[in-house]
Amino acid sequence: MMVNQKNILFVCDKNERTSFGRLTVNLLTAVCNKFDAHVLWLKTPKFFSDEKSAEENAADSRGFTSHEIWAKSLYSGFFSFRAPFKKLLHRMAPDMIFFIRPELGFLVPVAAKACPSAKTVMFVHDTFAETLYPHSVKFKLLNLFYIRPTVKADSFVYNSNWTRGEAAKFFGPQMSQKPGAVIGCPIDSGLFKRPESPVTAEAKAQFRRKRGMRNYYGMCLNVSLDEPRKNIDTYFEMARLRPDVAFVRVGKFSDRLKAIVNEKKLYNVFHFREFDARELVEFYRHADLMVYPSFLEGFGLPPIESIACGTPAVCAKASAVRENLEGVCPLVEKPDDAPAYAAVLDRVLAGENVIDESAAQELLSRCSMESFASRVTGFLDKIVQEKSR
């Protein structure tokens, strides 16, 4: 460890198989060469069901130190996380405490009281939990007790300019007037990349047959949660319009989605609950088109991952997806215009390259770990300098 190296503690409540868990590891990787990096995993059976409590802090071979605190759930953790969190902070005396999402905002005042000299940083990804469910008692309570204290953080980082603007509208000057930076999100270019040789039409057909998709002449892919903002209904309508193409969706197959599939008799829709990253790469590479019709996204990684793997994407011209992908791939003006997505599919299956390769390379460079690390450490260096004044 370098002399005078500042130490930083990242706080995350989800495992490495989730997007937040992977992002936490990406952040640790980004800073571990310049900072003494630690991570506190706030563990619950929901996200760490296959793990046992560790007796000691663990030095990870990836260059950081892991700590953990257990609770039965994030709800009970609202109370039970506090005391052991304070104890860890007193022992570590970190220079910076970095929270991975606003739902952990209830711990910001705890950190400020336990380590008044430490700078707190909050990563803001979107404002969907805050704004999309105004009549939900669950989300009202989540906002009031968990998220609202987020504004007490010393500084903020955002995944997109769009998110930064939306956060300013919702949280107001308590957030917008504090130090902040857009750091984006990275993709693992060692994993999400083109194969050494192009995937042939026969290889794609063989891939489909192996996974039970027989007698289809193409495959579309969608990776998403079942939330109204994801606009999965339009993806299914696209499937109805092109019955000779297989439409794969990765994500939970809810009762609502099952009802749509059954009602429309969508025999060409195939659901997979989840993949590990390497399986997902194979689906990206063997798909003909990634379809991402979301009304709202804070960033939108899946279409970027798909393009990195050599497969084109078509997306809705909305929110942060527009910010990231305009000029790179086709964007549909009206997010629920299923025929417009189907028309792009027809172009792809006819052999047209719908991607601007130069713009795509620029995007992938911006989303590389190297670029991400530069933005993250650049912002944290500023915080360190301000702290030492």
Which residue ranges define each predicted feature?
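Short hydrophobic beta-strand element within catalytic cores of glycosyltransferases
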Residues: 312-315
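Nucleotide-activated donor-binding/catalytic signature segment of Leloir-type glycosyltransferases, i.e.
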Residues: 258-281
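N-terminal strand-loop element at the rim of the active site
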Residues: 13-18, 30-76, 163, 178-179
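Short alpha-helical donor nucleotide-sugar binding micro-motif in glycosyltransferases
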Residues: 282-287
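Conserved donor-binding/catalytic core segment of Leloir-type glycosyltransferases
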Residues: 9, 212-230, 239
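Aromatic "clamp/platform" in nucleotide-sugar-dependent glycosyltransferases that forms part
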Residues: 295
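Conserved acidic donor-binding segment of nucleotide-sugar-dependent glycosyltransferases
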Residues: 330-339, 347-352
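Membrane-proximal helix-turn-helix segments that form the acceptor-binding/catalytic region
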Residues: 138-156
